[in-house]
Each structure stands twice: as C-alpha cells, then as structure tokens.
Amino acid sequence: MTDGGGEKETEILGLHGSEVILITDTEEFDLIDNYKKIRDCVDSSVNTSVIVVGDVMLDRYIYGYANNLNTTAPVPVLKETDRKSGAGAAAHVARSLHDLGLKPKLFAAIGDDSNGVELEQSLENLGIDTSNLTMIEGRKTTVKTRIIGSRESLVHNKQMLLRLDGEDSEPLHDELQKPILESVLKEIPNSNIVVISDYGKGVINPKAAEEIISSAKSANVPVIFDPKLTGLPYSKGSDAVLFQSRGMELMRRRLNYENTDETAQHLLKENDWGGLFVIGGKDGVTLHRPDADSLVVPCTLTQTLQQIGLLDAAAAALCVSLTNNLEMDDGAILVNAACECVLQGEDLDGYVLTKKGLTTRLDESAWQMQISQR
C-alpha cells in the first residue's frame, strides 16, 4: 500500500487495541533483524534451570480409520491402526524445555499405578530428571485418552472422535503436599525461572502458589503461571500469565466488560501480573501489559490442524524469552512462533515444541518478510 508521498507501507505484526499498525519499509527491515535476534536467543538458551511445578498426566492416543457407522446407532466404528502415549500437562512443558536445551526440574505427583510408572518411564527415556516426581500410594494417575479417526481415503483429515478422562482431582493432603512444596522452595534460589502449570488436579493450591511466588520474588526469579480460571487468585504477583482466548472471553462476560482489553487491564491490576498472554490459536497471540496498549501478533499459518499443547508451548517459549531478557513484545513474537509449530502438529510428537521446529518457524517468518519486500 502506498500513501500520498509514495512511501510503501505494510500491515504486519499487528494491532494495538483495535488500531492496525502500518509498518514502513525501514521498520520492516528492523523487524526482520528482530526475528533473527530472537532466533539466535533460541540457539543460545542452554543450561538454564527451570522449575516446573504442577499437575502431570499421561496423554494416550488411539488412531484409526472411521469408515463406517455402527449399524444400531449413529456412532463411528474405529478400525484401530496405532496407539501412542506420552507425558502431558506440566510434563509437556518439561519435555519442550528439555528439547530447547534448558534444564527442567519437574515437581509433581503421580499415582502408584501402571500409568504412573509409564509416565515416569517416558520422561526418563527422554533424559528428563524425574527425581522430584512424587508417587502417591493409592492415588490414580491422570490419563487423557483421545480417540482420533479419519476416513481411509482422507488420512490427512484426522478428527478427535472422543476423549476419555481417568483422574483423581482431589487436592493432596497437607502431609503429601508439604514435602513437594518444601522441595520447590529449596530449589528456587538455584533456578532461573519458575513455571506453575495448574490443571486443577490437586497439586497446586492457594497456599502452595502463594509461597512459591513469594519465594521466587524474594530471589528475583520470574514466575510464569498457566492457571485454571477458578484459580486466578492463586496467581497474584506472577510475571507472566497465560490464558486461552475462550477463557478471556469468559472472563469478559463474568466481569461485564465491553471488550477484552478492558478485561485484561482489570485482571492485570487486580492480580498484580507483569503481563498477560492470550493464546488464540489461529487468531494469534495477544499481549496485555499494565496501563499499555495491547499487542497482537497474528498467526501466519494458512491452515491449523489442532490445538493440543498450545499453552505448554507458550510457557516453554516464554522461558526462552525471559532467559535472554527479551522485551515482552519480542516474547509475544516468540510465543506466537511456538504456537504456530504446535498448531501444525499431526501426531503426539508434533504436539511438543522442539528447538528445530521453533528455529525453522522463525527463519520462515523472517524469509517471508524479505520476500514481501521484493
């Protein structure tokens, strides 16, 4: 697009509030350099110690062909072709951090059942330290089983047909919670970042969250919090908080605001957050900061395949950003690139953020900008 003076402008990176930002050629070159700088940060993020505390679960996937309906009911009949499983939730974050070259220390509880053993073994097979996983006698390990089907003639159009959840979401008793919390608090001074991943399965409670955040602040260790909407008070004082867009819309309605920008400012001030990252999938990533305009980094994908692991990828990317002292705007760019990697995932391994996937995505984004200038 050309203005009256003949200078070319390009719509890129975003929006501030509802206003489209028009970036000139000179600014776009700066943005390309910025992408390259962010990409270099991904390469240099090694040996950073990250505490990941929260709920873990075993993600199980059953794949097959759904060519027919049952003769007595309108339900698909799945011809099973494959089964896969891997560690999910907070363990998903740890897996991504490990692949990115950081050093995750995972603090969580699992059951003393075969699923707990499988979850622990899957992490050990990846080289992730499991010494801080607590096996609780008589507790059931959370398992999410997703049944995914496609027509045999359309193998690339997979759809989730059903999800089965097996879980024990009762809060841990104090005598079981206390050793986990004490271990986390002891490790905070030796760590660079804390990630709290609350899936409402019993590990995180108000007292634990408050003590972890307070201890981290005292040690100048930033906290990233992925909260349940019912647990927002737990997250007070966090440096960065992650929401999904549907959660943000729910909060807007609950608080009776006209738009999500007003909602975000309310939440930021009420909970003393440093920043709020709203993950929108195909709608990109929106960054809200206290008393500042919002920034939207749009998703550049022409097609998205799934959304499993989006917030986990975002949390891992934020760790890279904080490790390298990037500005929050650059952090939003990195988070968006991480989400784009996962949005293209086609199977269990594709739902986990990897260094190769993230650097490739950043390279592609910078290349697309260069092409657009020709």
Tell me what each language-model feature is.
Residues 26-38, 171, 190, 207-237, ...:
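Conserved phosphate-binding/catalytic region of the ribokinase-like
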Residues 2, 6, 11-25:
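Short glycine- and acidic-rich boundary segments immediately preceding or forming the N-terminal edge
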Residues 52, 106-108, 225, 278:
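Structural beta-sheet core signal
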Residues 67-73, 77, 147-166, 172-181, ...:
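Conserved beta-alpha-beta core of the PfkB/ribokinase-like small-molecule kinase fold
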Residues 25, 50, 58-195, 352-374:
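Conserved N-terminal subdomain of the carbohydrate kinase-like
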Residues 53-54, 244:
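A secondary-structure boundary/capping signal
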Residues 36-46:
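A short acidic-Thr-Gly-centered motif at the start of a beta-strand
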Residues 55-56, 199:
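Active-site metal-binding loops of divalent metal-dependent hydrolases
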